[in-house]
From Swiss-Prot:
UniProt function note: Pre-mRNA processing factor involved in disassembly of spliceosomes after the release of mature mRNA.
Domain of life: Eukaryota
Keywords assigned by UniProt, alphabetized: ATP-binding, Helicase, Hydrolase, mRNA processing, mRNA splicing, Nucleotide-binding, Nucleus
Amino-acid positions noted as binding ATP in the UniProt annotation, renumbered to this chain: G100, E101, T102, G103, S104, G105, K106, T107
GO cellular component term, pick one: spliceosomal complex
Organism: Dictyostelium discoideum
Region feature Disordered, mapped onto this chain: 1-41
UniProt name for this protein: Putative ATP-dependent RNA helicase DHX15
Domain Helicase ATP-binding residue range list: 87-251
Record lineage: Eukaryota, Amoebozoa, Evosea, Eumycetozoa, Dictyostelia
GO molecular function terms noted in the UniProt entry: ATP binding; ATP hydrolysis activity; helicase activity; RNA binding; RNA helicase activity
SUPFAM superfamilies from the UniProt entry: P-loop containing nucleoside triphosphate hydrolases
Family, as annotated: Belongs to the DEAD box helicase family. DEAH subfamily. DDX15/PRP43 sub-subfamily.
Length: 727
């Protein structure tokens, strides 16, 4: 097995181990706090309804020195000046729309104003949604400090597969997806007195569904208040949707920002971004730099180039920091640290509105972001690099004017900004696969999807395709009603395909293996590929690669991780992301609890059986039979159904080219790639999803492929008896 070479062995290893131990202690502390929450909640719930507001929300008599230091900074925020006006309006109205530019303080202060106004009754909470996990965690941490409480006690957070709260929590920051999931077990959101939908301008899929659900709940719960907060002037649309709710405007940008455009479009926006950062560092005054890029690989490569250029040119030191959602929390928090040298933060659009970073004076904006797209006819959902909207460009520029006059360097022409960029990014609901959301709505009893109160109704084609997908997966019957399997599928915080894969795994005696694969697919990528060690990293990955494909490779990684005692050093040596696999381990435990709740047995297959890997692959195929590709020639495949010509993504460990394979992702970049691939036999697909493959609407080449396979299958099965493989 390939091992990572350490340049200065002993000192580096000791430092690395010390850092990893620190991470482990932090993660263990979070886990312990979360576990304690579960046991104390039940006892406390019995008495908290009898408490007064003063007993429920503690009135502290003594505060730390840091509390008073932070308080002075809070009073300088633009939103603080409107505290009394806001409290008056929210007391008099059930719904309030608040527009405040990024940096106005609305995300941290408005929930505290709600508490100060006495609007949270004993045993109830104010829930604040965020579109991104990193924002939910970082803002909860900040607010707990501002209120002089310990994170996870009075102020907590909840993201997918992770919650830090207690029986004393009266303020909770959570992702919009988590609030949507909570509504399935608490349809009237009874635990909340006030709900704040923050960053509503981002129009995520979950936020748009919450608009419709909460609008209906407000009619039944006159004691519930809703605050919709946006960083852009889409307020008129929100006001109209919520029956002319009052609008409060809060100024945000404290200082002017000078905008610079390029004379012509950059041929390579990454090279142009690096060059611009070096020019700023060489020729401009003090102040930190924020660069917007589209994804993890771009960001890591650009950080390395900036560091190398700075070093080779003999420039003053500059701390270059990456920021993206899958980055470990302890690394994300470094962007808030103060340091003597200039900071250059290279980020996805997570820094556009979700996080406020003090000290930014210069912004570099290439004008691109990764955006989700969905083709309902081909059922292909992809992340594409696409131009941003004018609203996003203005948000990015606004990051530079927080603490003093700033500059924004746009790596595109003024003409492109004025004539080519759209005004607002299209709502996610208009460009997403809706199968998961439709399943949740059906579970909530929303059967008339066509007349559901969407702010922007999705095209009928998208809803029809979502219903078709759920029907083929067995979640809906022929009348469109939720089946027993569909009801169980809705309980998993997963895509319907993964849920189906889990449910059928018990029948084939491999639920433990499928749990592992589902968990690994739900966590960040476990393989690390540093720019300077790519050959060694690729060699290390090959030692885990499975002959049959990437899903089984993930199983190998997890088993090796457990066999080696979850050792961070072992992960480091083998170019594995320790935190990602630990997260997968935590996800696995939660998914196992859901299986147990529905009395689905946790069993492992006999690894020595000739059917061991076949049963695992059949379970994967039971969820992903709609994502099949057939080999057409050497390295070229075509996808069944939409007949797209595709090739394997370079990251796959499947070196041979099987006739048929299933894939998890369709990736559109310079090529049409399929990623996370496993070899399957077509007769399995006919056995697992006969109704899907009997469709008359398939295009010609797909029909011919299916008919040919059916003839081969019927011919081979008539000449031999096929026993059950469920052993």
């Amino acid at each position: 097995m390939s091992k990572r070479k350490h340049e200065s062995s002993d000192s580096n290893k000791k430092a690395m181990k010390k850092q990893q131990n620190k991470i482990e202690e932090e993660e263990e502390e979070i886990t312990n706090t979360t576990t304690t929450t579960t046991t104390t909640n039940n006892n406390y719930n019995n008495i908290k309804s009898n408490l007064t507001i003063d007993q429920w929300i503690p009135k502290k008599e003594t505060f730390s020195k840091r509390y008073y230091e932070i308080l002075e900074k809070r009073k300088e925020l633009p939103v603080w000046k409107q505290k009394e006006d806001f409290i008056k309006v929210i007391k008099e109205n059930q719904v309030v729309i608040l527009v405040g530019e990024t940096g106005s303080g609305k995300t941290t202060q408005i929930p505290q104003f709600v508490v100060d106004a006495g609007l949270i009754r004993p045993g109830k909470m104010v829930g604040v949604t965020q579109p991104r996990r990193v924002a939910a965690i970082s803002v909860a941490k900040r607010v707990s400090e501002e209120m002089d409480f310990e994170l996870g006690e009075e102020v907590g957070y909840s993201i997918r597969f992770e919650e830090l709260s207690s029986a004393r929590t009266f303020m909770k920051y959570l992702t919009d997806g988590m609030l949507l999931r909570e509504s399935m077990s608490d349809p009237t959101l009874n635990k909340y007195d006030v709900i704040i939908l923050d960053e509503a301008h981002e129009r995520t899929l979950s936020t748009d569904i919450l608009f419709g659900l909460i609008k209906d709940i407000l009619k039944r719960r006159k004691d519930l208040k809703l605050i919709v907060m946006s960083a852009t002037l889409e307020a008129g649309k929100f006001q109209k949707y919520f029956e002319n709710a009052p609008l409060i405007k809060v100024p945000g940008r404290l200082h002017p920002v000078e905008i610079f455009y390029t004379e012509e479009a950059a041929k390579d926006y990454l090279e142009s971004a690096v060059r611009t950062v070096i020019d700023i560092h060489t020729n401009e005054g003090t102040g930190d730099i924020l660069v917007f890029l589209t994804g993890e690989e771009e960001i890591e490569d650009t950080c390395a180039k900036i560091q190398r250029e700075t070093r080779e040119r003999g420039l003053p030191p500059m701390k270059t920091l990456p920021l993206y959602s899958s980055l470990p929390i302890y690394q994300q928090s470094k962007i808030f640290d103060t340091c003597k040298e200039r900071k250059c933060i290279v980020s996805t659009n997570i820094a556009e509105t979700s996080l406020t970073i003090d000290g930014i004076v210069f912004v570099v904006d290439p004008g691109f972001s990764k955006q989700k797209t969905y083709n309902p006819r081909s059922r292909v959902e992809s992340l594409l690099v696409a131009p941003i909207s004018k609203a996003s460009a203005n948000q990015r520029a606004g990051r530079a004017g927080r603490t003093r006059p700033g500059k924004c360097f746009r790596l595109y022409t003024e003409k492109a900004f004025k004539e080519l960029m759209i005004q607002q990014t299209h709502p996610e609901i208009l460009r997403s696969n809706l199968a998961s959301v439709v399943l949740q709505l059906l579970k909530l009893g929303v059967v008339d999807l066509v007349h559901f109160d969407f702010m922007d109704p999705p095209v009928p084609d998208t809803l029809i395709r979502a219903l078709e997908v759920l029907h083929y997966l067995g979640a809906l019957d022929d009348e469109g009603q939720l089946t027993e399997i569909g009801s169980i599928m809705s309980e998993f915080p997963l895509d319907p395909q993964l849920s189906k894969m889990l449910i059928v795994s018990a029948e084939r005696s491999c639920s433990n293996e499928i749990l592992t694969i589902a968990a690994m697919l739900s966590a960040p990528n476990c393989f690390m590929r540093p720019k300077d060690n790519r050959i060694e990293a690729d060699s290390a990955k090959k030692s885990f690669d499975h002959f049959d494909g990437d899903h089984l490779t993930m199983l190998n990684v997890y088993h090796s991780f457990k066999k080696n005692g979850e050792d961070p050093t072992w992960c480091y040596d083998n170019f594995l992301n320790h935190r990602a696999i630990k997260q997968a381990d935590s996800v696995r435990s939660q998914l196992a609890r859901i299986l147990t709740r529905f009395k689905l047995p946790l069993v492992s297959g006999d690894v020595n059986s000739k059917f061991y890997y076949e049963n695992i692959k059949k379970c994967i195929a039971a969820g992903f039979f709609m994502q099949v590709a057939k080999c057409e020639k050497k390295n070229i495949y075509f996808t069944l159904g939409d007949e797209q010509s595709v090739i394997f993504h370079p990251s796959t460990g499947l070196t041979r080219r099987p006739e048929f394979c299933i894939y998890n992702e369709f990736v559109l970049t310079s090529e049409n790639y399929i990623r996370t691939i496993t070899d399957v036999k077509f007769d399995w697909l006919l056995e697992l999803a006969p109704s899907y493959f009997k469709q008359k609407s398939f295009p010609k080449k797909t029909k011919e492929t299916i008919q040919r396979a059916q003839r081969l299958y019927s011919g081979s099965s008539s000449g031999s008896s096929s026993g059950s493989n469920k052993k």
